[in-house]
Design a protein with these regions (language model features):
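HIT superfamily nucleotide-processing domains
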Residues: 1-110
């Protein structure tokens, strides 16, 4: 475990997209973000900020992607709500324009 508070915790992803990829999860088992309490949302955001500071120091990324997959149609593969905090590095992909919009390639450019 990387970081923890009363309602959430952060750990490195077992299958990282990039060096330093962190997952932020609720302590309580909740399948969907929209079923979390306001306190759990705040607890996860607190850890996102703390993890970002840690990653800035350890990995010095050039940017971040932050996201949640809600439901199978959105790519959720783990039935426990979690944020992905993904460090990004200059040159780590050919064309990062559009960021998370790239999940649907035809919508990446706008």
């Amino acid at each position: 475990m990387l970081l923890e508070n009363a309602l959430a915790y952060a750990r490195y992803d077992d299958h990282p997209v990039s060096p330093g990829h962190v997952l932020i999860l609720t302590q309580r088992h909740v399948a969907d973000y929209f079923d979390t309490t306001l306190a759990e949302k705040h607890a996860m955001l607190e850890l996102i900020e703390a993890a970002r500071l840690l990653l800035n120091w350890e990995y010095a990324p050039d940017g971040y992607n932050l996201g949640i997959n809600c439901g199978a149609a959105a790519g959720q593969s783990m039935p426990h709500v979690h944020y992905h905090l993904i460090p990004r590095y200059q040159g780590d992909m050919e064309n990062p324009r559009g960021g998370v919009r790239g999940v649907i390639p035809d919508r990446q450019k706008y």
